[in-house]
Amino acid sequence: MKETPSPYKPAPFFLIAFAVTWFFWFVDAYFSGNGGSQALQGLLVFLGICGPAAAALIMFWLTRSPELWSDYRDRLVSLRHIDLRTLPFILFLFPALICTAIALSLPFGGSPGQFAILFGPAIMTLPALTGIFLAPALEEAGWRGYGVDSIRSRFSLFFTSVSFGLLWAFWHTPLFFITGFYHNSLLSSWLFTANFFASTVVMAFLVNWIFYRNNRSIIACFLLHLSADVSMSIIPAEQFTRCVVTVLMFLVAAAIVIGDRDLFFKRTAPGIGS
């Protein structure tokens, strides 16, 4: 029997997502070094974050499949897909990893002051709040709404996670050129820059596992992504400690892949595009 072709088109999706995001973020990078107002820069960052979600909506419109659109809306708003047994992992993994990494950093000169919660003015600015709360929502609406499924419909989850992780890391590139942005500060060290890209690839494995173990719930992925962003924002972990966090993330991801190898290495992907 001839295999039914997948309705998902990964290449156009990622091209649109990158084009939208990079246009606004590279414009932001220009204005950040040429006297652009903070309000304008915040708007450009927000518009860039919309890239994945905009790409997903465009692809659903081009596909014109009521089934895919209905499936997307359901996964975007319904809580019934979430497996409650995964909630502790979703909500507490990153606070636990960061605190463990801080403890491990102390013998190597890390500051005990990393064990703190910050809610200072720098955290409460509009650009910061946009990044912390809106970024996970808009990203996951696109990445897990269409992007990851589009790759998974053709390949194993392991290959999907590697390839998507690399694309996701590369997608952030313009942020490194925005003066005053967190990513721009990482350019002072090749290790810290490399750690960001490595952590993003590993993060793809963790979020994708939650995604498919929660019946492709976008809300579950948003909560895990939000937990990571909030934890990294309010716990003042030093850059060396963040490297330790990445190592711990890798160990958790490796344990998940080994323990759930059928999910990661089976070619079939039930429910996608059906």
Regions found by a protein language model. Give the residues of each.
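Specific transmembrane helices
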Residues: 2-136, 164, 195, 233-274
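Alpha-helical transmembrane segments and their helix-entry boundary regions
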Residues: 10-14, 87, 146, 160-161, ...
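Active-site His/Glu-centered metal-binding helix of metallohydrolases
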Residues: 23, 137-142, 146-147, 151, ...
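Short juxtamembrane and helix-loop transition motifs at transmembrane-helix boundaries
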Residues: 51, 92, 122-128, 178-188, ...
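Membrane-interface helix/loop boundary segments of multi-pass membrane proteins
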Residues: 138-165, 212-217
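Membrane-helix boundary elements
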Residues: 154, 158-188
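Functionally important transmembrane alpha-helices
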Residues: 185-249
